[in-house]
Curated annotation (Swiss-Prot):
It catalyses: L-seryl-[protein] + ATP = O-phospho-L-seryl-[protein] + ADP + H(+); L-threonyl-[protein] + ATP = O-phospho-L-threonyl-[protein] + ADP + H(+). The modification Phosphoserine is found at S273. PANTHER family: CAMK FAMILY PROTEIN KINASE, NIMA-RELATED KINASE 11. One of its GO terms (molecular function) is protein serine kinase activity. Keywords: ATP-binding, Cell cycle, Coiled coil, Kinase, Magnesium, Manganese, Metal-binding, Nucleotide-binding, Nucleus, Phosphoprotein, Serine/threonine-protein kinase, Transferase. This is Serine/threonine-protein kinase Nek11. Changing T108M: In a colorectal adenocarcinoma sample; somatic mutation. Interacts with isoform 1 of NEK2. Residues 29-287 form the Protein kinase domain. The active site is at D158. Residues 346-385 form a coiled coil. Protein kinase which plays an important role in the G2/M checkpoint response to DNA damage. Controls degradation of CDC25A by directly phosphorylating it on residues whose phosphorylation is required for BTRC-mediated polyubiquitination and degradation. Belongs to the protein kinase superfamily. NEK Ser/Thr protein kinase family. NIMA subfamily.
């Protein structure tokens, strides 16, 4: 289980995580880029240094929480550990949580397909709608994820299209448990997370939050996937709340099956006890038939993937069998694995020294061979020039002597005889050429020892090596010089590196990794098993979980007022930035008076349009007032506004 890390020093202000690229967080996560920001905090894409290959990318969510008490961090740690145990293909994996400075950080699975809300807006702008079979498939995936949560007596509390993510065209419920983790036992956790489009009537009326509230939110997501709009919409915050609490139940367009519309309407029943549970919805005949079709399709896809994997594994085994590994190599690898990290570091330094010696030897051999070739070329060239000069001089002298000795009446020898004599004289002279006969004007160039040493030093300086002393005692100090700052943290890293190196030496270059690199294959296989379990399930006895009776874990609320105030502070700053400080104050004060006097919506809209171009621009201010009212109720204080509900 991952440890919950507490900041060594906690400053008074809110200090955000550095956004500088390649920033290392918690000595493990490398910051890649900023993905976005929300009401609770900022989301970053990070790379996990300790993750398997292909699984490095993760999401870090940074939430500013201010100063934390020790009991709060312990309680948060317990709930974070609970969330990290959840493993389902329709739920974004919760990896870890820790405190960095005064920010609460959550590490989750990375989904490259963005969230469902972005997908809906993309299709809406293009004038397209989702195919019916795609909506049914996604709806079933969400039902499987919600049923998995409710079976473990855990609520999501913030289901909405922004918290549903796509990965390989499969839906995954994200931000799971975040609001519950941050708000503790506060019944207003869902209310304080954003717009009210997905809130159930009982949550808005503070009548408790249970599994049926998640079912209501899931129905709102289904409607949004079908109609590309919210199930409950309005010009201002309170109008949306009134439609949810008192308005009529929306219906799907006629292009969708009546069975699907009936399912959605049953999920939007204002009486929580009359809403079906997730497993009951999956057992409805219409969806049961869709489940069987999906299971057959997923099984076929899984079978094809397994066949491909078997072929790759067979090729990998053949390559491994063909490669010869000596017993001595295996023994050496075994000895390396038994070493401590300190011994492995010493061994690597020895190997680096040997590698340097080999490179130096190679450089010297190359220089020696180059000098030998140059010397031979010069020797051959000077020898040819010397031979020509000597032969020409001897031939000339010999001809002069023959002329002097020859009588006047005798004819000179034939050209053939003269040539034979010349070749004979050349052979006699060519047997005795030495370096002593070379002229002094053309000396043989040679490499000076100091020049050779400078060349070697220049060649090795690029390798980043330093001089290794020849004295054994000094060399021992050289090999141990890096251990002064050695710590337990580097022990783990060195151990991992040392264990990876022998495997790389044995493994063939084209071999397949031992783990699955395609996450979609494992998700589809897991979904097929989930569908099989649902189809084989006959019991519909699913308990309703309420936050008032059965909570996730006992103990005091976590963060509560701190998180609520942080939320409202950011909302206030956002509204002031949009409207301007003076306009914001005017709208805020007017809406506060109007709600207290129970003014009509038409009157409020008319007055607001005198201050701002559109009354809808004041939606966030109206929402801020509502949140402030609910916070006062939660803290046991008397509300200042008129209760409309």
């Amino acid at each position: 289980m991952l440890k919950f890390q507490e900041a060594a020093k906690c400053v008074s202000g809110s200090t955000a995580i550095s956004t500088y690229p390649k920033t290392l967080i918690a000595r493990r996560y490398v910051l890649q880029q900023k993905l976005g920001s929300g009401s609770f905090g900022t989301v970053y894409l990070v790379s996990d240094k300790k993750a398997k290959r292909g699984e490095e990318l993760k999401v870090l969510k940074e939430i500013s929480v201010g100063e934390l008490n020790p009991n709060e961090t312990v309680q948060a740690n317990l709930e974070a550990q609970l969330l990290s145990k959840l493993d389902h293909p329709a739920i974004v994996k919760f990896h870890a949580s820790f405190v960095e400075q005064d920010n609460f950080c959550i590490i989750t699975e990375y989904c490259e397909g963005r969230d469902l809300d972005d997908k809906i807006q993309e299709y809406k702008q293009a004038g397209k709608i989702f195919p019916e079979n795609q909506i049914i498939e996604w709806f079933i995936q969400l039902l499987l994820g919600v049923d998995y949560m409710h079976e473990r007596r855990i609520l999501h509390r913030d289901l909405k299209s922004k918290n549903v993510f796509l990965k390989n065209n499969l839906l995954k419920i994200g931000d799971f448990g975040v609001s519950r983790l941050l708000m503790g036992s506060c019944d207003l956790a869902t209310t304080l997370t954003g717009t009210p489009h997905y809130m159930s009537p009982e949550a808005l009326k503070h009548q408790g939050y249970d599994t049926k509230s998640d079912i209501w939110s899931l129905a709102c997501i289904l409607y949004e996937m079908c109609c590309m709009n919210h199930a409950f919409a309005g010009s201002n915050f309170l109008s949306i709340v009134l439609k949810i609490v008192e308005g009529d139940t929306p219906s799907l367009p006629e292009r969708y099956p009546k069975e699907l519309n009936a399912i959605m309407e049953s999920m939007l029943n204002k009486n929580p006890s009359l809403r079906p549970s997730a497993i009951e919805i999956l057992k409805i005949p219409y969806l049961d038939e869709q489940l069987q079709n999906l299971m057959c399709r997923y099984s076929e896809m899984t079978l094809e993937d397994k066949n491909l994997d078997c072929q790759k594994e067979a090729a990998h085994i053949i390559n491994a069998m063909q490669k010869r590994i000596h017993l001595q190599t295996l023994r050496a690898l075994s000895e390396v694995q038994k070493m401590t990290p300190r011994e492995r570091m010493r061994l690597r330094k020895l190997q680096a020294a040997d590698e340097k010696a080999r490179k130096l030897k190679k450089i010297v051999e190359e220089k020696y061979e180059e000098n030998s070739k140059r010397m031979q070329e010069l020797r051959s060239r000077n020898f040819q020039q010397l031979s020509v000069d000597v032969l020409h001089e001897k031939t000339h002298l010999k001809g002069m002597e023959e002329k002097e000795e020859q009588p006047e009446g005798r004819l000179s020898c034939s050209p053939q005889d003269e040539d034979e004599e010349r070749w004979q004289g050349r052979e006699e002279e060519s047997d005795e050429p030495t370096l002593e006969n070379l002229p002094e004007s053309q000396p043989i160039p040679s490499m000076d020892l100091h020049e050779l040493e400078s060349i070697v030093e220049d060649a090795t300086s690029d390798l980043g090596y330093h001089e290794i002393p020849e004295d054994p005692l000094v060399a021992e100090e050289y090999y141990a010089d890096a251990f002064d700052s050695y710590c337990e943290e580097s022990d783990e890293e060195e151990e991992e590196i040392a264990l990876e190196r022998p495997e790389k030496e044995i493994r063939n270059e084209g071999s397949q990794p031992a783990y699955r690199t395609n996450q979609q294959d494992s998700d589809i296989e897991a979904l097929a098993r989930c569908l099989e379990n649902v189809l084989g399930c006959t019991s519909l006895d699913t308990k309703t979980i309420t936050t008032m009776a059965e909570d996730m874990s006992p103990g005091p609320p976590i963060f509560n007022s701190v998180m609520a105030r942080t939320k409202m502070k950011r909302m206030r700053e956002s509204a002031m930035q949009k409207l301007g400080t003076e306009v914001f104050e005017e709208v805020y004060n007017y809406l506060k008076r109007a709600r207290h006097q129970n003014a009509s919506e038409a009157e409020i809209r008319e007055c607001l349009e005198k201050v701002v171009p559109q009354a809808s621009d004041c939606f966030e201010v109206d929402q801020l007032l509502y949140f402030e009212e609910q916070l006062l109720i939660t803290m046991g204080k008397e509300p200042t506004l008129q209760n409309h509900l």
